[in-house]
């Protein structure tokens, strides 16, 4: 019996040193051993299976951590690429908007220089950039205080679409409408003088050929009672003489040369 007991103990010892089974069960003694044995002896007496499991755990942790770091790097690189492309797109859009704005400004400068200058003043003034409506109102008030006539003309030009397309023609029409009552009174009082005055409204070619005669004709304008009574008539007549073409010189050149004399007789 003693011999069998010794053989059984020997078999247990041999199987304990060579066994590589049940790693979960081997963890419990491994946790208990360091309480009674120093760490060096515990590490030396640790089973090979436990060492293999620990090595496997360390390797698996390192393998799992590497893809996470790589994914983070790829994600950061993707974010940087997206930000760079977004900034480039924003810059391209800003450049396109600037080009469109410059083209519209050039077209506005060709069509309406006054509006172009006002827009340039708005962009150059920081107060106008902060509040363009208040700045425009302030400018309009200053214009109304400095020159009420120009302010009224500007308001009429802004309110009338025909005036926006052709401001000069619109102003001439407004001036003509203002002097229509005076002209109608002249036509009723003296039809001959009215017809002669209508013939003298276009530009006098003699002013280009003979400046002295034209100046004499202009000096005789204040003698006209109609001009003295209504200064707008004088301004309108002068404007018409300087802005339109004399049809009389085409039909009858002799009458065109006599035109200053007729004007002196009338005025």
Swiss-Prot record:
Cysteine-cysteine disulfides: none
Keyword Signal carried by entry: yes
GO MF term (any one): nutrient reservoir activity
Family annotation (InterPro entries): Seed_Storage_Prolamin (IPR051529), Zein (IPR002530)
Keywords: Seed storage protein, Signal, Storage protein
Signal sequence bounds: 1-19
Family per similarity comment: Belongs to the zein family.
Function as written in the Swiss-Prot or TrEMBL entry: Major seed storage prolamin.
PANTHER family for this protein: ALPHA KAFIRIN (PTHR48199:SF1)
Name of this protein: Kafirin PSK8
Classification of source organism: Eukaryota, Viridiplantae, Streptophyta, Embryophyta, Tracheophyta
